[in-house]
């Protein structure tokens, strides 16, 4: 189901066209694009000054949008996820072999999250698939928490900034290892 918010529909159209946007998440603004658009991923890497070896987070409106990227999960792993989703917890889960290295970096896992942020979830629903998510900041700088901070950091180098307010979380999402449950960030 698509979102009635015209700004979300505009953001989705830009992403489908290969664009890069900024949008609010649970704790900070994120930079996002279509996970299948390598040129858009490369643009984000250039904007942030980030290495491709780190990989990216994919956010989604629901787990179904993430399944095509992941190996089948055990019942106990699924249970761990369900307790934290939707929400600000990102899980590192075993990636399928055909997941491109520009998404997973140098790892055999992929960082995924079912977002609890209403605009971000609405954007994923409107797109009909998961969205690349990385904090809106240049390497070594703090993540943007407002539209104004995004504009100051990136100027006109983004195709669109989806206006909105971040969630109540202070800072980026927590990251956990899906195999062990261990908190990594």
Curated annotation (Swiss-Prot):
Instruction: List its EC numbers.
Output: 2.7.7.87
- Keywords, comma-separated and alphabetical: ATP-binding, Cytoplasm, Nucleotide-binding, Nucleotidyltransferase, Transferase, tRNA processing
What disulfide bonds does the UniProt entry report for this chain? none
**Which intervals hold domain YrdC-like?**
5-185
PROSITE patterns assigned to the protein according to its UniProt record, in alphabetical order: YRDC (PS51163)
A GO MF label: tRNA binding
Entry's InterPro entries? DHBP_synth_RibB-like_a/b_dom, Sua5-like_dom, TC-AMP_synthase, TC-AMP_synthase_SUA5
Per the UniProt record, one Pfam family is: Sua5_yciO_yrdC
What is a single cellular component term in the Gene Ontology annotation? cytoplasm
GO terms under biological process: regulation of translational fidelity; tRNA threonylcarbamoyladenosine modification
User: Where does this polypeptide localize?
Assistant: Cytoplasm
Q: Which HAMAP family match?
A: TsaC
Its function, per the record, reads:
Required for the formation of a threonylcarbamoyl group on adenosine at position 37 (t(6)A37) in tRNAs that read codons beginning with adenine. Catalyzes the conversion of L-threonine, HCO(3)(-)/CO(2) and ATP to give threonylcarbamoyl-AMP (TC-AMP) as the acyladenylate intermediate, with the release of diphosphate.
- Entry similarity comment: Belongs to the SUA5 family. TsaC subfamily.
Q: What is this protein called?
A: Threonylcarbamoyl-AMP synthase
């Amino acid at each position: 189901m698509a979102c009635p918010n015209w700004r979300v529909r505009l953001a989705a159209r830009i992403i489908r066209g290969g664009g890069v946007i900024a949008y609010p998440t649970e704790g900070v603004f994120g930079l996002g694009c279509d996970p299948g658009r390598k040129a858009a991923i490369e643009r984000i890497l250039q904007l942030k000054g980030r290495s491709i070896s780190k990989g990216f987070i994919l956010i989604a409106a629901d787990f179904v949008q993430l399944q095509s990227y992941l190996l089948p999960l055990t019942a106990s792993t699924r249970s761990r996820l369900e307790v934290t989703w939707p929400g600000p917890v990102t899980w590192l889960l075993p990636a399928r072999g055909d997941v491109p290295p520009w998404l997973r970096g140098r790892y055999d896992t992929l960082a995924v999250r079912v977002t609890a942020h209403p605009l971000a979830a609405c954007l994923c629903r409107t797109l009909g698939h998961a969205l690349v998510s990385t904090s809106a900041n240049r390497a070594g700088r703090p993540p943007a928490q407002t539209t104004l901070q995004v504009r100051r950091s990136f100027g006109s180098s983004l195709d669109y900034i989806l206006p909105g307010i971040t969630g109540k979380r202070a800072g980026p999402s927590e990251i956990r290892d899906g195999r062990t449950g261990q908190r990594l960030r």
